[in-house]
Amino acid sequence: MSDWDKTMDLLFGFVTGHIHSRMFETILKFSICDLLEDGPKHYSEISKIIGFKNESYCYRLMRYFVPYKLFNESVVQVGLFSKTPSSTQFSKNGTLKNLGRFHCQDHHYRIFESLPKTLEMGKNQGPSSIGLSSFWEHFETDESYKQLFHNAMKDYTSLIIDRLISKISLSPNFKTVVDIGGSHGFLIGKLLESNPNIHGINFDLENIINSSTSKNENFQHPRLKHVSGDFFNSVPEADCYILKYILHDWSDEKCITILNNIHKSLKPNGKLFINDLVLDPSNYTKEAVFKDILMMQYFDAKERSINEWHQLFEKCGFKIDSVDTSISPQLMIVSKINSSNINLNDCTNFNSEIVEEKLKNSLPQFVNC
């Protein structure tokens, strides 16, 4: 690679992301990946199927993605495209199409117009870019967006569910497990299939559990109940709680409220299984730091390091027993601290310096298997 090519790669790597994703959104919008699933096609045929007025534009768009391994173009017959493992992932046969469409939504671009203002003011300004005071309002005002979000999260869960369930070891003494913010109950339903003596509760908001659309999509299992409520007020009593990608959506203050409510309802010797990213300062992944900025700009929330998780849990009377780093997001197993000197109603007295000192002497067991 010449010096010029290296320079251009450096430049394009930093400045073309928004254009690149807009081109990719066009690929998804017209389901071009789907059209290649049954065999190679010439761009002229693809243009005709979709109804493009200028077939050369279709060719140029598809050609753009050849270096990114989204499509293959024949060297024998120029313009003949075939699928790749990547294009299949973004087709109806894959698991990334809904996730791709979700992240390419227009307002996701607009939200980041106010990133400089977020930094200047010290509070996220993302929702104001689309005329909202909170990003969660978007789920109340746009039914199609809410449905796309739930489809995307279901696909995301399908990517990790088998691995995650294999890591969740439930005590034979557990009778009830609650999935907090479990959407349509896909995860807890699958967990019940491999744990025949457990009863499950899928706990989420009223408009998610009981809407006409949701009732058709809710996972059905004889030992599973779908219960609506607000985890900022209370949660159902249980021996075990699962929180998959929930706490990273909220500030420390909001997380404290959620965890305190769980602490009140967790039965003796109970456990929490927290599936969330754990930032590693010695090895930041692109996924982790990207999602951290998303959480900041969308929700005034964040991804957390192991020290930050420790501090958060200890504020609410919990401790980390182990962290499984063999899956991502990581799986933390959390239990109550057996101590009488923790005042759950006065988290403002928490002293981070004391916790930092404790961390030096009592880090959790890290499991990598």
Swiss-Prot record:
UniProt keywords, alphabetically: Methyltransferase, S-adenosyl-L-methionine, Transferase
A GO molecular-function annotation: methyltransferase activity
Binding site for S-adenosyl-L-methionine: 181, 204, 229-231, 244
Pfam families: Methyltransf_2 (PF00891)
Keyword Cell membrane set for record: no
Family affiliation: Belongs to the class I-like SAM-binding methyltransferase superfamily. Cation-independent O-methyltransferase family. COMT subfamily.
GO biological process: biosynthetic process; methylation
Reactions catalysed: resorcinol + S-adenosyl-L-methionine = 3-methoxyphenol + S-adenosyl-L-homocysteine + H(+)
Gene: omt12
Signal peptide positions (record): none
EC numbers on record: 2.1.1.-
Functional summary from the UniProt entry: S-adenosyl-L-methionine dependent O-methyltransferase that may be involved in modifying resorcinol ring to synthesize a variant of 4-methyl-5-pentylbenzene-1,3-diol.
Protein name: O-methyltransferase 12
Coiled-coil region list: none
Superkingdom of origin organism: Eukaryota
PROSITE patterns attached to this UniProt entry: SAM_OMT_II
InterPro entries: COMT-like, O_MeTrfase_dom, SAM-dependent_MTases_sf, WH-like_DNA-bd_sf, WH_DNA-bd_sf
Record: active site: 248
Organism: Dictyostelium discoideum
Lineage: Eukaryota, Amoebozoa, Evosea, Eumycetozoa, Dictyostelia
